[in-house]
From Swiss-Prot:
Organism: Neurospora crassa (strain ATCC 24698 / 74-OR23-1A / CBS 708.71 / DSM 1257 / FGSC 987)
The organism's place on the tree of life at top rank: Eukaryota
Stated name of the protein: ATP synthase subunit beta, mitochondrial
InterPro entries in the cross-refs: AAA+_ATPase (IPR003593), ATP-synt_VA_C (IPR055190), ATP_synth_F1_bsu (IPR005722), ATPase_a/bsu_AS (IPR020003), ATPase_alpha/beta_chains (IPR050053), ATPase_F1/V1/A1_a/bsu_N (IPR004100), ATPase_F1/V1/A1_a/bsu_N_sf (IPR036121), ATPase_F1/V1/A1_a/bsu_nucl-bd (IPR000194)
Entry-linked NCBIfam families: atpD
Keyword Magnesium part of the UniProt annotation: no
Main location: mitochondrion
Subcellular location: Mitochondrion; Mitochondrion inner membrane
One GO cellular component, as annotated: mitochondrial inner membrane
Residues where ATP binds: G195, G196, A197, G198, V199, G200, K201, T202
Keyword Kinase attributed: no
Length: 519
């Protein structure tokens, strides 16, 4: 859908939108905070240059004057009749600037004119973006015409000052048992979903959209960074079916996509495009915004590709030397201020399941809660495949969640840790060599492990099991019941893919009745 959308829109409405965006560049600079104005925007364009060299996504532009466009300024040129945006990355000397293209450069020729816009990449923001799909440069790709707004913002900006920031300690209830009990999310915080390939990050983030964004009164921004176009397409149509996006009414979500078929320049900047839209709702409308990013690793990966294209010497494991700075500049903008908040949920691909890889390790430092998806748990058929011992949250504090919640969570983690330490003995000697107390620990731990599974609404078409949302009070009460031995008489299968303890008991009694009938 998106590919045809891009080409169809380019034939019809793109020229008019391009003209509108150019007209709006200078007024947009007036909306910037003072530090951002001085650092990221020049007061006026420096005129036209000419394409000097094209090497893949890297384009060199030569100007006739010593006055060159600043780093991060956007240049515009025409490629096969379509607007192509270039972002200035380096000054090479002899009036040449090196740029990264935000789209394919096939067909671009030397000598073509490139105009300085006088500002960074500038995108439409505000209510007009809701229900629309835009790309990294703010052009709509949903075949529904130009975005009609007079509000524009550059994608590069400073993080809010410390005096503007606010810290709150409020739980964001997701309805997912393992998260709400063991690694609860903070409203207005940053949440990371860590996992290797195929362990369920995107399904998990879609369930969070289903559980939180639909019940959430404010606006949401979903940013697809270097992921599958099919998933973005499915998400768009699913949101239409559930009225989160209403084509002729009020929508609650803006979608921003720079998918895996896009050049590295687009993938390295599209997260900033989504963040800029979320910042507008936070700063200008005082909203509590949900920002979903899938996948933040692709942001780092694209930065690594761009760094290599620019000829920088790579750092550890081949990543860009500016890895920590690139991540920090973006993450520091995702924060809660006195005006409003941004609650960010970020999927983080973990290369080769190695959490010490520099990309996920750099991301860890910025997060309030980390949900680690484990391949070992997914191989047991337990979904969501959240590792209850690796997942952490600063919100799991008795002063925030209360004593009952804290004690239940720590007891669950303790019994799972004891089971983990006993597994080697069981593998070598068998269950019979354990003491009675250890046998009871193992039995309860296995039931808890299965009870941490949960049927998802978004996976209902695949599993055939109706999705369950579990209230936090029911989650705590259910795990307390298992720890107290109230489920000792039930088989392990009773605790698999159910909601609360009452559902597990009903399922267990049904299983026992069937077994008695067979006997």
């Amino acid at each position: 859908m998106f590919k045809s959308g891009i080409s169809a829109f380019a034939r019809t409405a793109r020229p008019s939108f391009a003209a509108a965006s150019r007209r709006a560049v200078r007024p947009a600079a007036l909306n910037l905070r003072a530090p951002a104005l001085s650092r990221f925007a020049s007061s006026a364009g420096v005129g036209d240059g000419k394409i000097y060299q094209v090497i893949g996504a890297v384009v060199d532009v030569k100007f006739d004057t010593d006055k060159l466009p600043p780093i991060l300024n956007a240049l515009e040129t025409q490629n096969n009749g379509q607007k192509l945006v270039l972002e200035v990355s380096q000054h090479l000397g002899e009036n040449v600037v090196r740029c990264i293209a935000m789209d394919g450069t096939e067909g671009l020729v030397r000598g073509a004119k490139a105009s300085d816009t006088g500002a960074p990449i500038t995108i439409p923001v505000g209510p007009a973006t809701l229900g629309r799909i835009i790309n990294v440069t703010g052009d709509p790709i949903d075949e529904r015409g130009p975005i009609k707004t007079d509000k524009f913002r550059p994608i590069h900006a400073e993080a809010p000052e410390f005096v503007e920031q606010s810290t709150t300690a409020e739980i964001l209830v997701t309805g997912i048992k393992v998260v709400d009990l063991l690694a609860p999310y903070a409203r207005g915080g940053k949440i990371g979903l860590f996992g290797g390939a195929g362990v369920g990050k995107t399904v998990f983030i879609q369930e969070l959209i289903n559980n939180i964004a639909k019940a959430h009164g404010g606006y949401s921004v979903f940013t697809g960074v270097g992921e599958r176009t099919r998933e973005g397409n499915d998400l768009y149509h699913e949101m239409q079916e559930t009225s989160v996006i209403q084509l002729d009414g009020d929508s609650k979500v803006a979608l921003v996509f720079g998918q895996m078929n896009e050049p590295p320049g687009a993938r390295a900047r599209v997260a900033l495009t989504g963040l800029t839209i979320a910042e507008y709702f936070r700063d200008e409308e005082g909203q509590d915004v949900l920002l979903f990013i899938d996948n933040i690793f692709r942001f780092t990966q694209a930065g690594s590709e761009v760094s290599a294209l620019l000829g920088r010497i790579p750092s550890a494991v081949g990543y860009q030397p500016t890895l920590a700075v690139d991540m920090g500049q973006m993450q520091e903008r995702i924060t809660t201020t006195t005006k409003g908040s941004i609650t960010s949920v970020q999927a983080v691909y973990v290369p080769a399941d190695d959490l010490t890889d520099p990309a996920p390790a750099t991301t860890f430092a910025h997060l309030d809660a980390t949900t680690v998806l484990s391949r070992g748990i997914s191989e047991l058929g337990i979904y969501p495949a959240v590792d209850p011992l690796d997942s952490k949250s600063r919100m799991l504090d008795p002063r925030i969640v209360g004593q009952e919640h804290y004690e239940t969570a720590t007891r669950v983690q303790q019994i799972l840790q004891e089971y983990k330490s006993l597994q080697d003995i069981i593998a070598i000697l068998g269950m019979d060599e354990l003491s009675e107390a250890d046998k009871l620990t193992v039995e309860r731990a296995r039931k808890i492990q299965r009870f941490l599974s949960q049927p998802f609404t978004v996976a209902q078409v695949f599993t055939g099991i109706e999705g369950k949302l579990v209230d936090l009070k029911d989650t705590i009460a259910s795990f307390k019941a298992i720890l107290a031995g109230e489920g000792d008489d039930l088989p392990e299968g009773a605790f698999y893919m159910v909601g609360d303890f009452a559902s597990a008991r009903a399922k267990g009694e049904k299983i026992l009745a069937e077994l008695e009938g067979q006997a």
